[in-house]
């Protein structure tokens, strides 16, 4: 457990290397979890369906390639998001160390910097997140071109269509990354300190290795309701409603019209019950735990390779 931790407070890390390593880790994570991401989004935006029904419907209507629906904007989003997240984490950390004398613990430092990095990466990659959501929500088997979807959003909603729900997303992602980096570094620091005081290293070595999955599980579970609401907001004004599984949910989506984030959340609870905020949470955890672990692990791997 004596390897360099590139996310630790006071570590001197190249912002350029962090940007490159973050982009590569984002692409690597996306490649591994794309099918799970598609199913998770389907569950979030389609009321009343169950996991098994979604899986069967995708296979029947779209075939196996349906699980990679929106993979191009999804991959671009993960590359931009990963690069912006880790690159801004390093840059913001360097700025705070140089311009401010923050007398805070490494754990709190990770929460603060992680939150700012999360909001930065969310804003930078958000248009592709909107595209990814609309591609994944599409229930028809025919191939949709990225250019056509971009032009449809531009024609019907204008520039702001690519940033639908962006404000709430930045809060959601900021909170998510604050928890993720905070828990990750807390576990790393705890295990390193305990291993120095104990002759039995194995339990702490295992916990150290599980820092990524645990941080992913904790952050996703804590912020999932916010993520579900923002997914609904992202497709409520979609110019291609007929593509989505919304034949029996049009009245539900009409009730979201002109409502802000909190209003949509309240409407979901009133019409579908409190558990609607956690629709797809099982699939999300199955996706997010390995995704976060892969992202953090591969980031450290690429950083070590880049020197």
Swiss-Prot record:
<dbReference type="GO" id="GO:1990545">
    <property type="term" value="P:mitochondrial thiamine pyrophosphate transmembrane transport"/>
</dbReference>
<keyword id="KW-0999">Mitochondrion inner membrane</keyword>
<feature type="repeat" description="Solcar 1">
    <location>
        <begin position="13"/>
        <end position="95"/>
    </location>
</feature>
<keyword id="KW-1133">Transmembrane helix</keyword>
<dbReference type="InterPro" id="IPR018108">
    <property type="entry name" value="Mitochondrial_sb/sol_carrier"/>
</dbReference>
<feature type="repeat" description="Solcar 3">
    <location>
        <begin position="203"/>
        <end position="305"/>
    </location>
</feature>
<feature type="transmembrane region" description="Helical; Name=5">
    <location>
        <begin position="210"/>
        <end position="226"/>
    </location>
</feature>
<comment type="similarity">
    <text>Belongs to the mitochondrial carrier (TC 2.A.29) family.</text>
</comment>
<keyword id="KW-0677">Repeat</keyword>
<dbReference type="InterPro" id="IPR002067">
    <property type="entry name" value="Mit_carrier"/>
</dbReference>
<dbReference type="Pfam" id="PF00153">
    <property type="entry name" value="Mito_carr"/>
</dbReference>
<feature type="transmembrane region" description="Helical; Name=2">
    <location>
        <begin position="76"/>
        <end position="96"/>
    </location>
</feature>
<keyword id="KW-0496">Mitochondrion</keyword>
<feature type="transmembrane region" description="Helical; Name=4">
    <location>
        <begin position="160"/>
        <end position="184"/>
    </location>
</feature>
<dbReference type="GO" id="GO:0005743">
    <property type="term" value="C:mitochondrial inner membrane"/>
</dbReference>
<comment type="function">
    <text>Mitochondrial transporter that mediates uptake of thiamine pyrophosphate (ThPP) into mitochondria.</text>
</comment>
<feature type="transmembrane region" description="Helical; Name=6">
    <location>
        <begin position="280"/>
        <end position="297"/>
    </location>
</feature>
<protein>
    <recommendedName>
        <fullName>Mitochondrial thiamine pyrophosphate carrier 1</fullName>
    </recommendedName>
</protein>
<keyword id="KW-0813">Transport</keyword>
<dbReference type="GO" id="GO:0090422">
    <property type="term" value="F:thiamine pyrophosphate transmembrane transporter activity"/>
</dbReference>
<keyword id="KW-0812">Transmembrane</keyword>
<feature type="repeat" description="Solcar 2">
    <location>
        <begin position="105"/>
        <end position="190"/>
    </location>
</feature>
<keyword id="KW-0472">Membrane</keyword>
<dbReference type="InterPro" id="IPR023395">
    <property type="entry name" value="Mt_carrier_dom_sf"/>
</dbReference>
<feature type="transmembrane region" description="Helical; Name=3">
    <location>
        <begin position="108"/>
        <end position="126"/>
    </location>
</feature>
<feature type="transmembrane region" description="Helical; Name=1">
    <location>
        <begin position="19"/>
        <end position="36"/>
    </location>
</feature>
């Amino acid at each position: 457990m004596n390897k360099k931790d590139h996310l630790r407070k006071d570590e001197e890390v190249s912002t350029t290397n962090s940007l490159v390593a973050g982009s590569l880790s984002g692409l690597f994570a996306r490649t591994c979890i794309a099918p799970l991401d598609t199913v998770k989004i389907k569950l979030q935006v389609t009321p009343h369906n169950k996991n098994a029904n979604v899986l069967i419907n995708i296979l029947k209507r779209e075939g196996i390639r349906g699980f990679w629906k929106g993979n191009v904007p999804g991959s671009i989003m993960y590359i931009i998001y990963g690069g912006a997240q880790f690159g801004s984490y390093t840059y913001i950390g360097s700025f705070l160390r140089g311009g401010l004398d923050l007398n805070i613990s490494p754990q709190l430092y990770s929460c603060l910097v992680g939150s700012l990095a999360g909001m930065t990466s969310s804003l930078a990659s958000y248009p592709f997140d909107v595209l990814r959501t609309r591609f994944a929500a599409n229930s028809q088997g025919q191939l949709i071109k990225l250019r056509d979807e971009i032009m449809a959003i531009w024609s019907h909603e204008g520039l702001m269509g690519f940033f639908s729900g962006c404000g709430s997303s930045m809060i959601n992602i900021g909170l998510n990354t604050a928890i993720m980096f905070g828990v990750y570094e807390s576990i790393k620091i705890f295990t390193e300190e305990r291993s120095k005081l104990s002759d039995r290293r194995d339990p702490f070595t295992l916990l150290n290795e599980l820092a990524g999955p645990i941080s992913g599980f904790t952050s996703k579970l804590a912020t999932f309701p916010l993520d579900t609401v923002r997914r609904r907001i992202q497709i409520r004004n979609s110019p291609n409603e007929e593509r989505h599984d919304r034949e029996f949910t049009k009245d539900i989506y009409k009730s979201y019209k002109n409502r802000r984030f909190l209003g949509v959340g309240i409407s979901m609870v009133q019409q579908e019950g409190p558990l609607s905020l956690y629709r797809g949470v099982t699939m999300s955890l199955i996706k997010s735990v390995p995704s976060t672990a892969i992202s953090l692990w591969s980031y450290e791997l690429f950083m070590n390779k880049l020197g």
